[in-house]
Amino acid sequence: KVVITISHAGYIKRTPLTEYKTQNRGGVGQKASKTRDEDFLEDLFVGTNHQYMLFFTQKGKCFWMRVYEIPEGSKNSKGRAIQNLINIEQDDKVKAFICTQDLKDEDYVNNYFVIMATKMGQVKKTSLEQYSRPRSNGINAITIKDEDELLEAKLTNGNSQIMLAVESGKAIRFEESKTRPMGRNASGVRGIKLKDKNDQVVGMVSVNDMDANILVVSE
């Protein structure tokens, strides 16, 4: 297995899981990556070299990469800029990541979904099967309206509970099953009504365990 780390500034690397020694609970931890002063680790995944990483950009495009294609780096390296690994436009930025199983497995891709949320409260659900045929230049994942941008993308089983939180302090929860699957070029439907034009969605989570707790942290 490997550990994939992604920093806020968009640096990515994979490191063998064996480089991380088991510690007792309450320890000080180990260094996972070297970052610049203004950068910090933002995402971490554990997977295998044969899994796929899906990258979703703020303009609504999706790019693929096999995990083994992600540059390998030690715990003390910062990794490579994602912008240099995929054919992303210069004024675009990767906003969300999904680590999936084999995209050639028809049973798998037909039973999982990608649900996306935008800054202005749109949500869209699409079958994972529609992302199973990689193209070097990426594909359109969602049509983004003017002044909006993609914020989050999550992999779901079709029966999750979806929660959206907005900057003004409100949140909404709804059943994913009530959101019908759409094609990749659709712009989605309203997930939450914003307070005013200055309000925006700040996060989305998908929950399968109805006994789970949600931790909300303000700045």
Regions found by a protein language model. Name each.
Residues 1-219:
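Short, structured "edge-of-domain" segments at secondary-structure transitions
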